């Protein structure tokens, strides 16, 4: 896959009741190869992972197809598209189990994925093409 993005940033809040390594695993289940930094905010920590690895979005590509959620994924990408950024939020516990769920309503907050790209349309078409009867048509 050619590089259609400059950087992928993944962010989540980590609360005192949570294991930071489990939150890291949840984030890595979606975007492998992240380099992490943690910021202590007192009541919680903010965990930020970044990567410029050109294969960073391959896992999401596979999950969207494996879970047959291309239409939902496309809708979420389009909703989260602002200029040269695409932002999606996914459920943290579901990510820990190695799946994607766009229901971000979780007491522990979502995982936020920000894709920085100069070619957002091209990237969306690759990551989650439009479908007809579940089959990609782009």
Curated annotation (Swiss-Prot):
Sequence similarity: Belongs to the UPF0201 family.
Protein name, per record: UPF0201 protein PYRAB09730
Organism superkingdom: Archaea
Record-linked Pfam families: RNA_binding (PF01877)
InterPro entries given in the database record: PAB1135-like, Ribosomal_uL5_dom_sf
Species of origin: Pyrococcus abyssi (strain GE5 / Orsay)
């Amino acid at each position: 896959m050619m590089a259609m993005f400059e950087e992928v940033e993944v962010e989540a809040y980590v609360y005192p009741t949570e294991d930071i390594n489990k939150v890291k695993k949840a984030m890595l289940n979606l975007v492998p190869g992240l380099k992490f930094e943690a910021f202590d905010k007192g009541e919680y920590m903010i965990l930020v992972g970044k990567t410029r690895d050109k294969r960073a979005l391959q896992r999401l590509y596979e999950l969207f197809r494996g879970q047959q959620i291309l239409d939902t994924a496309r809708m979420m990408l389009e909703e989260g598209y602002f200029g040269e950024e695409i932002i999606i939020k996914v459920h943290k516990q579901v990510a820990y189990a190695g799946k994607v769920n766009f229901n971000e309503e979780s007491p522990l907050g979502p995982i936020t994925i920000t894709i920085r790209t100069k070619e957002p349309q091209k990237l969306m078409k690759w990551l989650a093409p439009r479908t007809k009867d579940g089959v990609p048509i782009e």
